[in-house]
Every structure is written in C-alpha cells, then in structure tokens.
Amino acid sequence: MAKEGGLGENSRWSLGGMTALVTGGSKGIGEAVVEELAMLGAKVHTCARDETQLQERLREWQAKGFQVTTSVCDVSSRDQRVKLMETVSSLYQGKLNILVNNVGTSIFKPTTEYTAEDFSFVMATNLESAFHLSQLAHPLLKASGSGSIVLISSAAGVVHVNVGSIYGATKGAMNQLARNLACEWASDNIRTNSVCPWYITTPLSNDFFDEEFKKEAVRTTPMGRVGEANEVSPLVAFLCLPSASYITGQTICVDGGATVNGFSFKTMP
C-alpha cells in the first residue's frame, strides 16, 4: 500500500499541510512552480538573488492569498545555502515535504573557449547547489515522513542542444543524481525526480536566445511552438502530490516532442 504521509486518501490531489522550498522563485519556471504549489495548498518558501524582484512577487502572492515566504540567497554560495536551509528548518519546525532545485544558469561559448572560472561558476550554480541543498534538506525531508525532491534539469541533459557543453554536462549529471537519490533515499520515504524542459519562454531564455534560435527551436519541435513556464509547473506539482507516491527516479521531458523527434519530412513521399 502506498504511504500517504498521514495526509489521508481524500488528499491525494492536494498539497494542503505540506511545506516546500523552491529555489529561484522570483521569475520564470521557478515563479510558476511557487504559484502551482501554493494553489494546491502548500506553504512555500522561495529564494532569489534580487530582493526587489522577490518583494514584488511576494506582494502579488499575498494578494492571491498564497502562503509564501521569501529570503535573499545566491545558491552558488555554499555558506548561503547553509543559511537558507537553516531558515527553512526554523520556519517549518525541522520538517520539509518538497524541495524544488530550480536555479540554473549557462555561459554560451565553444568548448575550447571556456575558462576555469566559467566551469566553476556553472557547475556551482547548477549541479553543486542541487547536490548540496538535497544533502542539507535530507533530515528535514525524512522528518516529514513524505518527501519529494524535483530537480529542474533540461532537455540539454538528455540530448545534444548547442547551448554550451558545461550546461549540458550539469543537466545530465542532475538527471543521474535524481536516479541515485531515488534509490538511496527510498527507505526514508523520499522520492526524487528530474524534469527536463525544452525551450520555455522565460526571462532567461529571452536574454540568451535570439529570434533565429527560437525559429530553429520551433522548427524542430513536433508541436510547432515553444513552451510556457505554466506548462512545466503542473508536472512539478504532480510529482510532489500524494497521488504520485510510486513515481521516483524518473527523468521526464516537457518539450513538445522535441527530444523524441528524429528526422521529420515535411511531406510523406
């Protein structure tokens, strides 16, 4: 029988009574995830580097009646990650149901042009932060009796996408981390899954990708369009629900079919 963590059969499609930490929640996919979890009843804490943006989002969330708290944190910093988890532990009395490792960045260069500093920065922001925050969250997730970790990875961790080899390497490693933690922490009733978006319209993608890149992304996507942040967040929320209690160690793409698209003829012969 599936463990419900004391939530009861009638709460299979609710996050009421649960607590969550979402990194990078002030914009893009992170913002959409915060709202999705809060709409389902979770108490959510989120962090970002920009305090002004955080306060703007917080006012919006409070106006909607969401139970959200915020703090400033640069998750590429080990000391700040430790402080963040101390804050979360204090807020939620040493228990946490949901951890969404969402923060990510990239530097787009040919592989031969990357510096040691480039490598360290992308690795620390994407992979090291997800690994360390999962470590720090483990006792809180275990104490909750029903824990779920979701790593926001990328289609670039599943197939080649020319957005930087370091970025792709970090995302591939995150997918494997999800598999490892799923097996290692299953006995603690902690599930871990990886969500891999393709081209999603966010402030980050708008900053990095020009219209030509977007056209190419659309051309290679069977659904013929790019995605939106609120098309990723429902999957993240589902993986945290009691109804997903037997799903762990999975890598799931949200990509309009892009990662399964081989070579598609415009017209059949």
Swiss-Prot record:
InterPro entries: NAD(P)-bd_dom_sf (IPR036291), Sc_DH/Rdtase_CS (IPR020904), SDR_fam (IPR002347), TR (IPR045000). Belongs to the short-chain dehydrogenases/reductases (SDR) family. SDR65C subfamily. It holds the Pfam family adh_short_C2. The keyword Metal-binding does not apply. Its EC number is 1.1.1.-. PROSITE patterns: ADH_SHORT. GO terms for molecular function: alcohol dehydrogenase (NAD+) activity. This is Senescence-associated protein 13. Transmembrane segments: none annotated. One of its GO terms (biological process) is defense response to insect. Coiled coil: none annotated. Signal peptide: none annotated. Substrate binds at residue 154. It is an enzyme of class 1 (oxidoreductase). Unspecific reductase providing both diastereomeric alcohols from the prochiral ketones. Active on cyclic monoterpenes and small flexible lipophilic carbonyls. No activity with tropinone, nitrogen-containing tropinone analogs, tropine or pseudotropine as substrate. The active site is at 167 (proton acceptor). It comes from Arabidopsis thaliana (Mouse-ear cress). NADP(+) binds at residues 21-45. GO terms for cellular component: peroxisome; plasma membrane. Induction: No basal expression in untreated young leaves, but rapidly and strongly up-regulated upon abscisic acid treatment. Strongly up-regulated (10'000-fold higher expression at day 33) in the quinolinate synthase mutant old5. The keyword Translocase does not apply. Keywords: NADP, Oxidoreductase.
